[in-house]
C-alpha cells in the first residue's frame, strides 16, 4: 500500500481543517488508514482522524483544531496499521480556505435597485472576520451564458445593482463566495443559491 498523491490540507481558520490525498489503488480509507495529527507544542495531545473515501482511491479527513492562531504548526502522520506511509506538517494560517457565506437574501422592493445581503460566516472575534471580501455570481436561470461576477472588494456583506442591468421578466439566481487576501487564501465554496424574478419594467419612451 502506498500514497500516490501526498495529502494537501486547507483550514477554515476557526475549528476545522480538511486533508485530501490519493492512494496507489482502490482503498477502504476508513478501514485501512488513520491520519494522526499533533500540534507542535510543549504539551499537546495526539489526535486521530478516520478518513472517508473520496472516489475509489481518494481519501479525505476532517481534522478538528481548536483556537487556531498564526503560529500553529501540526505534524501529520498517515498510518496503515503499524506501517507509516507518509509524514508531513501543516500550518493552518498558510493554507486558509474560508467558510462559505450564509443567509444570502435578495430584496427586490428597493426602488429600482436589487439589494443582496449575506452573513459573514465568522464570529466578530475571529481573525478572518474583518479580512473577507466577496464575489457574487448572478445568472439567468434559462440562459447559462447570461452570467456575471461582481467583485465586492469592501467588507460590508452587501451588493446593490440596478434592476435594469438584468433582463426584465426573467428568473435569476445568485450565489456568493469569500476569500481573505491578507492570508493568501483560496476561495471558499459557493454559498447555496437564491432565486428571484426580475420584474423591472422598462420605462415608456415619450415621443
PLM regions with names:
Residues 1-25, 84-128, 168, 186-207:
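Pro/Thr/Ser/Gly-rich low-complexity, intrinsically disordered linker/stalk tracts
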Residues 1-78, 89:
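N-terminal "mature ectodomain cap" immediately after the signal peptide
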Residues 19-24, 33-38, 72-81, 116-123, ...:
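Structural signature of extracellular immunoglobulin-like
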Residues 31, 132, 192:
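Residues that flank catalytic or metal-binding motifs in active/ligand-binding sites
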Residues 43, 84, 143-144:
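Short coil/turn linkers that define WD40 beta-propeller blade boundaries
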Residues 48-57, 148-158:
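Short beta-strand segments within Ig-like beta-sandwich modules, predominantly Fibronectin type-III
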Residues 56-91, 160-186:
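Beta-strand-rich modules
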Residues 150-159, 177, 185-195:
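Accessory, usually C-terminal, subdomains that scaffold auxiliary metal cofactors
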Amino acid at each position: 500500500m502506498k500514497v500516490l498523491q501526498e495529502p494537501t490540507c486547507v483550514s477554515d481558520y476557526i475549528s476545522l481543517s480538511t486533508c485530501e490525498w490519493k492512494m496507489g489503488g482502490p482503498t477502504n480509507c476508513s478501514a485501512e488508514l488513520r491520519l494522526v495529527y499533533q500540534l507542535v507544542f510543549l504539551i499537546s495531545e495526539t489526535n486521530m482522524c478516520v478518513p472517508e473515501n473520496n472516489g475509489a482511491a481518494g481519501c479525505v479527513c476532517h481534522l478538528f483544531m481548536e483556537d487556531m492562531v498564526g503560529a500553529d504548526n501540526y505534524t501529520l502522520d498517515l498510518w496503515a496499521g503499524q506501517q507509516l506511509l507518509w509524514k508531513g506538517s501543516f500550518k493552518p494560517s498558510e493554507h486558509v480556505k474560508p467558510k462559505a457565506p450564509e443567509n444570502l437574501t435578495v430584496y427586490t422592493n428597493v426602488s429600482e435597485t436589487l439589494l443582496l445581503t449575506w452573513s459573514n460566516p465568522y464570529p466578530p472575534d475571529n481573525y478572518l472576520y474583518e479580512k473577507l471580501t466577496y464575489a457574487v455570481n448572478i445568472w439567468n436561470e434559462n440562459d447559462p451564458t447570461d452570467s456575471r461576477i461582481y467583485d465586492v472588494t469592501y467588507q460590508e456583506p452587501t451588493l446593490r445593482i440596478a434592476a435594469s442591468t438584468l433582463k426584465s421578466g426573467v428568473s435569476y439566481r445568485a450565489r456568493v463566495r469569500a476569500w481573505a487576501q491578507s492570508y493568501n487564501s483560496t476561495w471558499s465554496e459557493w454559498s447555496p443559491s437564491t432565486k428571484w424574478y426580475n420584474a423591472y419594467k422598462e420605462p415608456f419612451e415619450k415621443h
